[in-house]
């Protein structure tokens, strides 16, 4: 983490180890400790930590004094350096962060403070105090620990150099916390802050810095017993507010959020920062919610005596009160230095709790009450040198705050004696302990009243236990925990709580919450105005008017709150479907939240801890892998998980672990139970809404994402054994990191009902999110419902002719966000089945000239295909609105923008589709062969001239089972749909705007870059099929037939996708088993060519022992038979096995059958010789091979089922079991049928 090392010297009292009387300098005078004596203890902190982040554990080591020496840099330099046994410089900790005083003095050595628990005898050492700020008011002679406000901040502003010092310290803390200390981002941000401070004397915190600082300030609050909840603080950034009415609106929203129908949530609202001390924003109330106090002429006080002065001030402002015992004071705020305004709260906003006792019925007759949410509003938030003078911080009550202090203190309600008399206690004799007895019963009443109404409160015993856990955690994580014993110890039953017996060190860290002078004392009233004269005229309203106003005001609060709560949607996709759903979700959320969308690869993981609402739409690639643009996010979450559990791994190890299939499998299981692999409890919304008192401070609810509410929609195909594995992994690990699950993860199956599942999930999660953040879902849901059914029309989409356009490769690159490369075909594709009979399928070898393209054997190439000309031409004939399909056109969308002058509309280019001809768009960019979605069918129904066509299309669109049966039976492309409904004539512009992207197709590279430089070879099976049980029209696989029809010198557009998990092992001493039937042999051709090149060109290099298992239908279609025989002759392939599944007079045999026959040898190759297994083929074959190898190894090694499963996962983790798996194809009808049946059962079972 750090490039310096902090030395902490701990004095140990031994015979000769006395403290030196010379304590000014290190050297002849050794800063308090004589290191020439027999022994001292040195703790090295910073340089020896792992992970590069804050909150690291200290690595301790003990050094003998003989191993230390003092080094003077020069005869003219009185600054000395303490050297370790290996000559390393042991820098001394400088609590000021200035690196010395510039006058030759070294920074102070931090002496650990030993703190003991008197009861348990446990000891801890606090070195965190070395980072304390110098605001202690105690002197060498006098302790000021019991002073109520030892340090009060006035209206003076800081000097720019002091601001910079604080800013540097804060930024160091912030970037350490996200493990980016000294990174380019850190350096850039520090330079930006320096320039801003030099120019203006101040600077502005980013939103994430503000959120981090607010949480850290709570964590640093030495007087707070409930700090274990610090990471769950909700921060409302209201620095944009400029008026008192805006402040009132924000405070009301805060109260609504924090109250949460009694399940209280901690939150802070932060208004604009101090500038010059003359334009401060202030909240004049000490607490946002409090009861008024009125002093009568006879000296008697009605209400709360603590608020008499402020109540009188409010009355002078013009506030009209009822002068009862329980009047809620108005909110008094001032903005930008102006005079204050007061505001009455809507009555329904404040939750109050009538007090009663479980045994004493008369207690309720006392008509006592208290409010639910405590909200401190008089303190200054000091963060990074910036002072925020107006903040409101809310949590929940510890019962003694109400029962002991508010109700029983002599200067408050002073109810102790009246209640004791009601209890029949003798109040004349203190030895009767009447005060103690009454105090206990009052606190019982408070707890009973709150708990019986499911309103969050915590008793002092639970709070004390939670603080001890926090104290222990902080000592481990930060080497100390500032704690003010006088404030931490509860006001009753003190000695029976553990905190009473715990020694504590009180010191102050920044960021912090500080006491500040009351606005009543510091405010400068505007000329000609006086607080006593500043009275506001009030209108009288009848009941109906008040009711309407309250309802309207509540709606305003809800809308304002929605603008402040950010919702982030993340997606990971291979085909674009997840992105499509994510964008629909963002549009839906935008009706109630400040919604943003990111691809996982573009998301800054350091922001995730500060998210309020996180929704994830994630697809699974292959048999459980994350999509390429989700891999880094998966690794980042895994790193966060390891960091949280105290484990640390090298980045390379982390990458392998986080991207291995076993990693995804192990973390995607839905049967992990209540506890995940970390032992961390998964929190969902049902848990969070229980309102349990003890759960509020339960340590099990914490984690780095404990303030994040999340939900996941996972996309996948049930044809794969690891269905939706990546989405399940994201859902599980977010929960394990402490996130609050809004609702159970939903899945969308590509085989059946995916769109239906999403359309069901999206409104549900939207409604729950609104409820969670106290927004009105009824008001917004009706508007938001249109987001999922938004219809483009001829009024909002149009085609416009343009002159400028981009080349095809540039357009493809932008459209797919991939670097498209233009290559050419070396020669016409070669048919690899020269001897096949007419009924066999064909496989071709495609040779591409790819100059300057780097790849490794095992990598994939993505081909951008083209749709068939006859389909494109047929669709164009049925479209309207475009006269010339070969004219360059730009698709434009009518956008609405909210401005100060109202709604502004303008035509803007489509965010995705390029400028090109309609023919090119349908040929190269849009998917016209996949059966249309139900949403598209709904649109097509609106374009029909015939009522029967319209009704039939609407039935398909609205009835899920009818649609699925039609889709499965016909598998129609768009031309066939338009032919089936001939009256459908859609406008071209609206039609193309509805279509999905034509996705690239991936193929394993079949050539070695060393043997065929500047070439890429592909082994491609030509796909053709007929729907309707073989009786329908012939359909053609888009890409395979596109490749088959290429001719020499034709242009082709592609990109290479690295597949590191399928690369050849660098350790060529280990044997290799290759298993791949049919075109699964494709990557193995690149392997044997590579080994052949190594053996031929690099004489001294060895190649591994290689066994190849290949399967096909008949001998006539044995792919690359001659090449394989040649490789056997060259000694590249040691053994080649051929499985034939349809050869006459030979039993049907598959590759796994041959593997079983060689069980003993395979077991030895894997278990004893530590060999590698490579499997390439469709998902069904891959699963059969996996189970076969599992069976072989279990039988030979006599292992249990559990042991074998663990070993197979270990093979993956060691990167010795490699898979390159195809999706299901239409020719595997039985698999498709089974998967579809499973998907329909899953859909039917969902509520």
UniProtKB/Swiss-Prot annotation:
Main EC class the enzyme belongs to: oxidoreductase
InterPro entries hit by this protein: CysJ-like_FAD-binding, FAD-bd_FR_type, Flavdoxin-like, Flavodoxin/NO_synth, Flavoprot_Pyr_Nucl_cyt_Rdtase, Flavoprotein-like_sf, FNR_nucleotide-bd, NADPH_Cyt_P450_Rdtase_alpha
Binding site for L-arginine: 287, 396-397, 401, 406
Cofactor(s), by name: heme b; FAD; FMN
Positions with a binding annotation for FAD: 855-866, 998-1008
Region described as Calmodulin-binding: spans on this chain: 537-557
Gene3D superfamilies the record matches: 3.40.50.360, NADPH-cytochrome p450 Reductase, Chain A, domain 3, Nitric Oxide Synthase, Chain A, domain 1, Nitric Oxide Synthase, Chain A, domain 3, Nitric Oxide Synthase,Heme Domain,Chain A domain 2, Nucleotide-binding domain of ferredoxin-NADP reductase (FNR) module, Translation factors
Positions with a binding annotation for FMN: 712-743
UniProt note on regulation of activity: Stimulated by calcium/calmodulin.
Function (record text): Produces nitric oxide (NO) which is a messenger molecule with diverse functions throughout the body. Nitric oxide limits plasmodium development in the midgut.
Protein name as annotated: Nitric oxide synthase
Source species: Anopheles stephensi (Indo-Pakistan malaria mosquito)
